[in-house]
Amino acid sequence: MGKCQVISHPLIQHKLSILRRQTTSTKDFRELVNEIAMLMGYEVSRDLPLEDVDIQTPVSKTVQKQLAGKKLAIVPILRAGIGMVDGLLSLVPAAKVGHIGMYRNEETLEPVEYLVKLPEDINQRQIFLVDPMLATGGSAILAVDSLKKRGAANIKFVCLVAAPEGVKKLQEAHPDIDIFTAALDDHLNEHGYIVPGLGDAGDRLFGTK
């Protein structure tokens, strides 16, 4: 079974508290999502493999470390996942970026996929699948399904806020997936929103209703 890790770094928790506030502006919300994603990236990438490399400093030759193994791909679930991409790219600027488009049917609460655009070598890459919210788990499960259909095998799901119901569903559907979140909240309400949550991340990121 994949793990669910809550990243409780003080800076992340401080910024998340501001992010949750109803009075936080669109501009500040967007910046905070970017900053939290970047800070989470350090923990999410902790187990990336390293290899020895010979280099010449201004003083002498030395053997140091550099990233090795599979290349990275960052795949946001549209539209809200877009807000997390730049923060992660600031750490791994050579990563490719794919897109999986989803919207939620407000009557059934089920996700509907409308776009899949991925690097051609997605099956050779370690993937950070990103979405600010893990609520019902439906979108995350469908996105992982899409990635696995295209040969992807090394996938981490990264979100800012998760509900226990969504974590349980994702782990049951894909027990090989590790989940990284900044907060594990209380529950989902009758509308499928995380409580206390932070509202609709997409609307708050882009200033829409």
UniProtKB/Swiss-Prot annotation:
5-phospho-alpha-D-ribose 1-diphosphate binds at residues 79, 104, 131-139, 200. Gene3D superfamilies: 3.40.50.2020. Pathway: Pyrimidine metabolism; UMP biosynthesis via salvage pathway; UMP from uracil: step 1/1. The keyword Glycosyltransferase applies. Allosterically activated by GTP. InterPro entries: PRibTrfase_dom, PRTase-like, Upp_B, UPRTase/APRTase, Ura_phspho_trans. One of its GO terms (biological process) is UMP salvage. It catalyses: UMP + diphosphate = 5-phospho-alpha-D-ribose 1-diphosphate + uracil. It comes from the Bacteria. Its cofactor is Mg(2+). One of its GO terms (molecular function) is GTP binding. Pfam families: UPRTase (PF14681). Keywords: Allosteric enzyme, Glycosyltransferase, GTP-binding, Magnesium, Nucleotide-binding, Transferase. Uracil binds at residues 194, 199-201. Binds 1 Mg(2+) ion per subunit. The magnesium is bound as Mg-PRPP. It is an enzyme of class 2 (transferase). Its EC number is 2.4.2.9. PANTHER family: ADENINE PHOSPHORIBOSYLTRANSFERASE, URACIL PHOSPHORIBOSYLTRANSFERASE, CHLOROPLASTIC. HAMAP family: Upp_B. Belongs to the UPRTase family. Catalyzes the conversion of uracil and 5-phospho-alpha-D-ribose 1-diphosphate (PRPP) to UMP and diphosphate. This is Uracil phosphoribosyltransferase. It comes from Streptococcus pyogenes serotype M1. The gene is upp.
